[in-house]
Amino acid sequence: MNQTIAIQSWCFRHFKSLPEFFPQLAAAGVTATEVCGVHANFAEPASAADTAAQFKQARVKIVAIGVEYLSGDYARDKPRFEWCKAAGVKNMSISFKPESMFDGLQNVEKLADEFDLQLGIHNHGGYDWLGNSTILEYIFSKTSKRIGLHLDTAWAIDAKQNPVEMAEKFIDRLVGVHIKDFLYDPHRNPGDVIIGTGILDLPKFMDVLKQANFSGPLVIEYEGDEKNPVPALSECVKKLHTLV
């Protein structure tokens, strides 16, 4: 396993313009990112070439975009796929509402085939209907491998799922990861911490990825310290480098 370490651009949401964002990413110690909607307009495919050119000039690799909330309507969702094709992006982390599960997912699969894009469902915690293994297992039984899992370790913990066991269970559909860690206050409110210092067993999780020769986007996410995220993110990067 020889993966490029990326950081979710949402971690730098305070730095909204690309000229502000790029130095922050570099200061954290990486040259790759999963781009969120703060730093690109995925609804406008015509913007993709210029955005991609700015990333190329800054020598920053886009490993994925997301998380994108898809409607299941072919025409409505198509611009996001067109954006990815124009920008040369091959991975998108996604979510969708329950009413999109049947006909909507067929449309999403059709778009993924048409634009040669790998999609990964983002499990967004205990409050999210896609946060538990049972529903994910059902969805994967009804879809092709164009739709896989973009596993968020902290939100798995929030849904009382073991992220190590979840990675093992869905290893053949694991197409991306958000490496993120939580600790909780007495009221069960989560707080982001440096990866491996909270509940996540980071060495065991990385062992699962290495044994499977995981090759998807490897993305750090730390949502704390919005106005000054670099110190914590730098520590996250250092920790992950020791385990990749």
Model-derived regions, located:
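Histidine-acidic metal/acid-base catalytic patches
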Residues: 1-6, 11-31, 83-88, 132-151, ...
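Acidic/polar N-terminal loop/beta-strand segments that form early-domain functional surfaces
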Residues: 10, 36-38, 67-68
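Aromatic/hydrophobic pocket-lining residues that form π-stacking "cages" and hydrophobic walls in ligand
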Residues: 21, 51, 80, 108, ...
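Active-site acidic/histidine proton-transfer and metal-coordination neighborhood
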Residues: 32, 57-61, 67-149, 156-158
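Glycine-rich, proline-tolerant flexible connector loops at the mouths of alpha/beta enzymes
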Residues: 34-52, 56
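Positions that flank functional sites
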Residues: 40-41, 70, 99, 126-127, ...
